[in-house]
C-alpha cells in the first residue's frame, strides 16, 4: 500500500501510514470533531517525524502508533469538543515540548494563528521540521514563559493559551494566564486528578475565573480533565513571578 499526500509545497510518499488513519477519522467522527481535510495525512507525517527525531533527542516516551494517536493526537484535539475557538484566533501553546497540544490543534484548525513557545531550542527545530513537512505556518519562540509573559508583544495578546503539563494547576495558571487577553481563555489539559479547588485562588489573583472543568476519557479508557479558565480582568504586572517563587510559594 502506498500512501501519498500533497501538503502545501511538499509531497510525502511512504510505504504505508504509521498511524491508523481510518481509526483516527472514525474517532474524530464519534467525538463530533470536524477537522481540516488534510488532517489525517498531516498527523501521520507528524507521527513519523516524532518517532524519527525521538531517536536522537528525548521528545516523548510514547512511540507506538496507537499511543501517539490516542494519547498525543486525540487528547490534544479534544478541547475542540468543549470550547468554541473563534476562526483565526491567536493561540499560544506554552511549554509546547514536542508540540502538544498546539500543533495537533493547528493541524485540525489551520485557520488558527499559533505560537509555539518552549525554553529548549532543539524542540523548536523539530517543530520547524514538522511544520515544513505539513505545509503549515506557526511562530516558534525560544523563551522561558515567565520572561515571555512580561513581553508586551506577547502579554495579553492571545485569545487562547494552552498547556499540557504535569505542573500543578496553580503554577500553570501563573505561567499561562498573563498571555491571555481579557475575554480569552486558558485551556489546561490535565490528568485524572481534579486540581481545580487548589487553583481557584490563583485564577482569581491572575484575572481568571473557572468556566469549565470537563472530565473525559480517551479511547483507551484513560481519564483526563480539560480545565477552561476565562480571563475576566487584566493580570497584575507583578505576575508571572520568578520560577523559584512560583514553585515554592504557589498562589
Walk through the language-model features, giving the residues of each.
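Single conserved hydrophobic/aromatic residue that forms the stacking wall/gate
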Residues: 1-15
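Short "lid" loop at the C-terminus of a central beta-strand within the Rossmann-like core
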Residues: 146, 168, 191-195
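Helix-to-beta-strand junctions that scaffold the AdoMet/dcAdoMet cofactor pocket
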Residues: 109, 180-182
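Conserved beta-strand signature within the Rossmann-like core of class I S-adenosyl-L-methionine
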Residues: 183-193
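Conserved SAM/SAH cofactor-binding pocket of Class I
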Residues: 77-165, 173
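Residue-level signal for inorganic ion chemistry
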Residues: 50, 105, 127, 190, ...
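Class I SAM-dependent transferase core
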Residues: 19-87, 92, 122-138, 142
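SAM/dcSAM-binding transferase cores
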Residues: 197-251
Amino acid at each position: 500500500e502506498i500512501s501519498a499526500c500533497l501538503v502545501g509545497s511538499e509531497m510525502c510518499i511512504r510505504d504505508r501510514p504509521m498511524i491508523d488513519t481510518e481509526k483516527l477519522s472514525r474517532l474524530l467522527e464519534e467525538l463530533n470533531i470536524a477537522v481540516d481535510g488534510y488532517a489525517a495525512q498531516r498527523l501521520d507525517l507528524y507521527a513519523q517525524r516524532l518517532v524519527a527525531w525521538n531517536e536522537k533527542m528525548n521528545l516523548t516516551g510514547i512511540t507506538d502508533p496507537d499511543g501517539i494517536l490516542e494519547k498525543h493526537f486525540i487528547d490534544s484535539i479534544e478541547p475542540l469538543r468543549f470550547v468554541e475557538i473563534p476562526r483565526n484566533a491567536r493561540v499560544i501553546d506554552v511549554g509546547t515540548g514536542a508540540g502538544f497540544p498546539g500543533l495537533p490543534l493547528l493541524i485540525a484548525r489551520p485557520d488558527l494563528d499559533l505560537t509555539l513557545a518552549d525554553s529548549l531550542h532543539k524542540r523548536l527545530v523539530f517543530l520547524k521540521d514538522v511544520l515544513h513537512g505539513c505545509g503549515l505556518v506557526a511562530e516558534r519562540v525560544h523563551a522561558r514563559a515567565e520572561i515571555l509573559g512580561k513581553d508586551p508583544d506577547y502579554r495579553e495578546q492571545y485569545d487562547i493559551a494552552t498547556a499540557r503539563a504535569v505542573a500543578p494547576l496553580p503554577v500553570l495558571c501563573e505561567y499561562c494566564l498573563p498571555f491571555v487577553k481579557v475575554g480569552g481563555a486558558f485551556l489546561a489539559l490535565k490528568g485524572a486528578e481534579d486540581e481545580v479547588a487548589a487553583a481557584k485562588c490563583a485564577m482569581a489573583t491572575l484575572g481568571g475565573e473557572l468556566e469549565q472543568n470537563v472530565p473525559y476519557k480517551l479511547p483507551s479508557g484513560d481519564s483526563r480533565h480539560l480545565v477552561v479558565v476565562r480571563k475576566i480582568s487584566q493580570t497584575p504586572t507583578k505576575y508571572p513571578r520568578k520560577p523559584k517563587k512560583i514553585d515554592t510559594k504557589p498562589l
